[in-house]
Regions:
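Short, low-complexity N-terminal intrinsically disordered segments enriched in polar/charged residues
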Residues: 2-49, 156-158
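A solvent-exposed, acidic/Ser-Thr-rich amphipathic alpha-helical stretch
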Residues: 43-95, 121
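Short beta-strand segments enriched in hydrophobic/aromatic residues
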Residues: 50, 105-107, 146-149
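Beta-strand residues in well-ordered beta-sheet regions across diverse protein folds
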Residues: 57, 102-104, 143
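Short, cysteine-centered beta-strand-loop-beta hairpins and adjacent loop/turn segments enriched
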Residues: 77-81, 107-122, 152-153
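Short, surface-exposed coil-to-beta transition loops
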Residues: 84-87, 102-104, 122-129
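A short hydrophobic beta-strand element
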Residues: 96-111, 126
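Short beta-strand edge/turn micro-motifs at domain boundaries
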Residues: 100, 124-157
Length: 158
């Protein structure tokens, strides 16, 4: 009986540790999108969320972090009104020192219409995304993000 009780306690501790461990890469992913939001951009600590050799595949192109920041600047990202990402259906896989997360990302952006001054656009997207994270000194950081746009709707706001 005592062996069974000890087994149950150890089993629940292992599950609790696993839950906490799986939460760490998700916290990094959510932190990345929070840092990327227009309310916080440019985030002075973006390097807390990505590795030095970070790579993102977006819109059929490969970007380093510096290249992606330049792309955002070209899109006048600093003039955007709002950005919102809702992540769902996350699947986390862990190995020693690394994690992989696949998820659905639904984003909604409001920004000035570049072709019609004074007009704002609302863009709604759905992406299937995947990130590979590595553990650097006890902190997960995103090394690679793959983003495939499934749907995109742009409408003028009244």
């Amino acid at each position: 009986m005592l062996v069974l009780l000890i087994s149950l306690v150890l089993s629940s501790v292992t599950r609790a540790e696993q839950m906490t461990t799986r939460d760490a890469p998700m916290a990094t992913l959510l932190g990345f999108f929070d840092a990327l939001s227009v309310e916080n951009y440019p985030h002075s600590n973006m390097q807390d969320w990505v590795t030095d050799d970070f790579l993102i595949f977006e819109m059929g192109q490969a970007f380093s972090w510096d290249d992606f920041a330049a792309f955002l600047a070209e899109a006048s990202y600093d003039t955007w009104v709002s950005t919102e990402w809702r992540l769902s259906e996350a699947r986390v896989s862990l190995t020693e020192g690394a994690a992989h997360i696949s998820y659905v990302n639904r984003g909604e952006f409001v920004y000035p219409d570049p072709d019609n001054p004074g007009q704002q656009l609302k863009e709604s997207n759905m992406w299937l995304e995947s990130v590979y994270l590595i553990n650097e000194e006890g902190q997960f950081r995103i090394k690679f993000l793959q983003s495939d746009n499934v749907s995109r709707v742009v409408e003028s706001l009244p």
